[in-house]
Amino acid sequence: MNSTEPDSDRVTRTDRLNAPEIADVQALARAAGDADGADPFDEHTLLRLRDPHAPTHHLTARTANGTLTGYAHLDITNPTSGTGVELAVHPAYRRRGTGRALARSVRAAVTGPLRAWAHGDHPSAAALAVDLDYRRARVLWQLRRPLTAPIPEPPLPDGVTLRAYRPGADDDAWLALNAKAFADHPEQGQWTAADLQARRDEPWFDAAGFLLAVDPAGQLLGFHWTKIHERPGSARIGEVYVLGVDPTAHGGGLGKALTAAGLAYLRDQRGLDRVMLYVDESNTAAVALYERLGFARWSAHVNYQLG
């Protein structure tokens, strides 16, 4: 463990957090999300926060009395291609130099390229990125749609049927299809059995809402994995969590049919009235598909790179 001393708070780096420290970070994330309208850490980061074996560095900023004022998460799974970074400062302790101190500590802790996410694309994050020579490299859109509006009912391709995912029995086939469908995706396509199991262990997991498209021989051709977000004080919202189609099945309308089937499940079986999804700005085909299905842009999440 080592530390640096910024102007206001003490920034400390460690490879593992204990239970009280994890609780502090989770509370900070909730406060920042409530204040900013966008959660500062994605699901991947929150899962690794609790995993003592994850290849991760943690940077915490605290006042002299030990109050957590800021946190930065460094994912060092593949430092050659770039260390992943997510950072947040507690709303009550902003404009004190904490964010800049954490960002500088991140640079001091890493020798290779950096890939930092700014969820919500806030002006302060953009200004800090410019000051520290990061370049805007990638944008994810969050799109939303009311489920009270009519949902299209496009037909499935001939011979294709839908069924629910079977935990354990479908794992290998789904992982293979996921890797194939997201071969060019920097995160999703690299999922392992451990990544799948980690999501299955989460309270939100619902096998009935994990829809698989199969051909007459039982081979997986596509999937729509739905998720429901529940947060105290907020209305529930569904998510098109992961949607994938085998490249050999592209062009037959399977993606549209899977999307519609998942939306109908969230509305009819789970009683939801709204849904969201994330899509890369550069994936113009997917953006066009979702817009035709009634989705509209809600917020942006920006990836900044250095080195």
Curated annotation (Swiss-Prot):
Q: Which GO terms describe its biological process?
A: mycothiol biosynthetic process
Which Pfam families does the record associate with it? Acetyltransf_1
Which InterPro entries did the record assign? Answer: Acyl_CoA_acyltransferase, GNAT_dom, MshD_Acetyltransferase, Mycothiol_AcTrfase
Q: What class of enzyme is it?
A: transferase
A GO molecular function annotation here is: mycothiol synthase activity
Q: Which CDD domains match?
A: NAT_SF
Key word Transferase present = yes
Q: Tell me, what does this protein do in biology? A: Catalyzes the transfer of acetyl from acetyl-CoA to desacetylmycothiol (Cys-GlcN-Ins) to form mycothiol.
| Record-stated family | Belongs to the acetyltransferase family. MshD subfamily.
* PANTHER family with a match to the protein in the record: L-AMINO ACID N-ACETYLTRANSFERASE (PTHR43617), MYCOTHIOL ACETYLTRANSFERASE (PTHR43617:SF31)
Q: What protein name applies here?
A: Mycothiol acetyltransferase
From which organism does this entry originate?
Answer: Salinispora tropica (strain ATCC BAA-916 / DSM 44818 / JCM 13857 / NBRC 105044 / CNB-440)
The record's gene field reads mshD
